[in-house]
């Protein structure tokens, strides 16, 4: 077939240059399903983009952002709603498990507050998790204390007092994006999208390296870059609800996995924040 390739000893549907299924139509629907119904689908296409986690106490199902139709659904929602399972689990007497799910619920609520920026709330989440990790064992009382309005407000004020120069932020995100793109380049994935973005990232890295023999040109470039960043930040604001939905879904689906402990949660939160930073920077470029 013209649509299949051999991979890992199996014949699978070959994706296009943008790593998209060739059977998606302009409305992001499967033309096979439209024409013949969902009985023609493979097992992968039947479950995609759904994901299921099987915990000892219950199963959780969620939609994943790898499908463009899911992004469209989230874009229509002001805020996503997720089930609270901690109370049900606490009734079973499994305190250790229920408190981890309560922690996830607290973080989901924290990221749902549009009165602060996404970046502020990600920082607050990370600092709270660090403190909780250092003050184990994790208890419901400890969570209520660290996520209380007064504690979060105090933490937010402390974060706002930290000097975070925008150029340093751009430079770090630039390096992060280049580092995370290495594996995609090795696999030859998303090249049409990644190559021009990475070319710009490399240009910025070189310009900010302070190796120029003309300091005036450096200052002009940095000033122009900051202006572009400010304009970008304003253009991004209408998409904050969608980005919050994406991040909160990542927290619900990836923060707490079967057999996770608090250290795993802390590491997963770091990855989610890195993921957001790299997506934001690729959009900027």
Where is each model-derived feature located?
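Conserved aromatic-histidine-acidic binding/catalytic patches
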Residues: 33-37, 55, 92-95, 99, ...
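Charged, amphipathic alpha-helical linkers/stalks
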Residues: 69-154
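Short Cys/His-based metal-binding microdomains
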Residues: 25-75
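Structured, beta-strand-rich domain cores
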Residues: 4-31, 36
């Amino acid at each position: 077939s013209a649509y299949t390739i051999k991979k890992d000893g199996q014949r699978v549907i070959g994706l296009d240059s943008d790593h998209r299924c060739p059977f998606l139509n302009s409305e992001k629907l499967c033309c096979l399903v439209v024409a013949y119904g969902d009985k023609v689908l493979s097992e992968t296409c039947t479950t995609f983009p759904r994901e299921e986690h099987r915990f000892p106490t219950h199963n959780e199902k969620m939609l994943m952002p790898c499908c463009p139709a899911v992004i469209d659904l989230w874009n229509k929602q002001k805020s996503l709603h997720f089930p609270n399972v901690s109370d049900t689990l606490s009734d079973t007497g499994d305190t250790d498990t229920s408190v981890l799910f309560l922690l996830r619920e607290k973080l989901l609520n924290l990221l749902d507050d549009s009165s602060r920026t996404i970046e502020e709330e990600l920082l607050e989440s990370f600092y709270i998790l660090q403190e909780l990790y250092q003050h184990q064992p994790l208890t419901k009382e400890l969570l209520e204390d660290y996520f209380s309005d007064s504690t979060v407000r105090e933490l937010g004020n402390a974060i706002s007092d930290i000097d975070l120069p925008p150029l340093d932020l751009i430079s770090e995100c630039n390096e992060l994006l280049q580092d995370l793109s290495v594996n995609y380049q090795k696999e030859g994935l998303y090249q049409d999208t990644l190559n021009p973005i990475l070319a710009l990232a490399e240009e910025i890295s070189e310009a900010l390296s302070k190796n120029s023999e003309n300091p005036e040109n450096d200052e002009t470039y940095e000033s122009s870059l900051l202006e572009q960043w400010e304009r970008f930040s304003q253009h991004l604001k209408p998409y904050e609800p969608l980005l919050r939905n994406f991040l909160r879904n990542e927290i619900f689906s990836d923060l707490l996995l079967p057999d996770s402990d608090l250290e795993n949660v802390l590491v997963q939160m770091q990855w989610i924040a890195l993921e957001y930073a790299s997506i934001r920077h690729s959009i900027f470029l």
